[in-house]
From Swiss-Prot:
Specific enzymatic cleavages at paired basic residues yield the different active peptides. The modification Phenylalanine amide is found at residue 86. The gene is pomc. The lineage of its organism: Eukaryota, Metazoa, Chordata, Craniata, Vertebrata. Transmembrane segments: none annotated. SMART domains: ACTH_domain, NPP, Op_neuropeptide. This is Pro-opiomelanocortin. Residues 1-25 form the signal peptide.
Length: 260
């Protein structure tokens, strides 16, 4: 009865020793593997070898590849990634020593150790979100410095000085200073009747009087020339009749034809 059991145990021990390269010397050097004459000693030696095995070399024939990584290996792997570290990139020289810290350091605080596992995960997620928002704000402020509305560079905007005229000085007591700018923008446009009576040559060649208001003859909205009025098709060679008179005559002719 004992020979099959001993053969199975020795076979398992041989499999462990064969698949474990570096751990084999550690198993034989331990005190638990010195006594292999009894079944209990062999089982203790197997347990010692199993404890020394890492997750990178799973236990055979078990399901060691399904087991999670150990804490030391997880720290080693996560330390290579950028998101494992916190801290602003544009930190000052005073914060160089305390600028970056790892995720595992947060979980080692004594206050956080009192909380449960779910609360600890929630706090870590909240800290990660806050740090991500701060990092985005710092990057946004850095990029916005290049634009005018982020950080104005150069001369500041100077206030516009308004000097009142002689006519505005008389009404300075009535209108406040803020309304004087609006008064300066009000132009007195010439009447159409006076322009029709005068020729273009007289308006341009005539001297400008001081008591007379300035007329903007060089602008388009001052008044169209005579050859451009009524759309340009009413030239003096054709007819001097206004456009409304032509429409009235056409309407009367159509009504007269319908009456016949």
């Amino acid at each position: 009865m004992l020979q099959p059991v001993w053969s199975c145990i020795l076979a398992l021990l041989g499999v462990f020793i064969f698949h474990v390269g570096e751990v084999r010397s550690q198993c034989w050097e331990s005190n638990k593997c010195t006594d292999l004459s009894s079944e209990d000693g062999i089982l203790e030696c197997i347990k010692a070898c199993k404890m020394d095995l890492s997750a990178e070399s799973p236990v055979f024939p078990g399901n060691g590849h399904m087991q999670p990584l150990s804490e030391n290996i997880r720290k080693y792997v996560m330390s290579h990634f950028r998101w494992n570290k916190f801290g602003r990139r544009n930190s000052t020289s005073n914060d160089n020593n305390n600028g970056g810290y790892k995720r595992e350091d947060i979980a080692n605080y004594p206050i956080l150790n009192l909380l449960t596992g779910s609360d600890n995960q929630n706090t870590q997620q909240g800290i990660m979100e806050d740090e991500a928002v701060d990092r985005q704000d710092s990057k946004r402020s850095y990029s916005m410095e290049h634009f005018r509305w982020g950080k104005p560079v150069g001369k500041k905007r100077r206030p516009i000085k308004v000097f009142p005229t002689d006519a505005e000085e008389e009404s300075s007591e009535i209108f406040p200073l803020e309304l004087r700018r609006e008064l300066s923008l009000e132009f007195d446009y010439p009447d159409t009747n006076s322009e029709e009576d005068l020729d273009d040559g007289e308006l341009l060649d005539g001297p400008v009087k001081k008591d007379r208001k300035y007329k903007m003859h060089h602008f388009r909205w001052e008044g169209p020339p005579k050859d451009k009025r009524y759309g340009g098709f009413m030239t003096p060679e054709r007819s001097q009749t206004p456009l409304m008179t032509l429409f009235k005559n056409a309407i009367i002719k159509n009504a007269h034809k319908k009456g016949q």
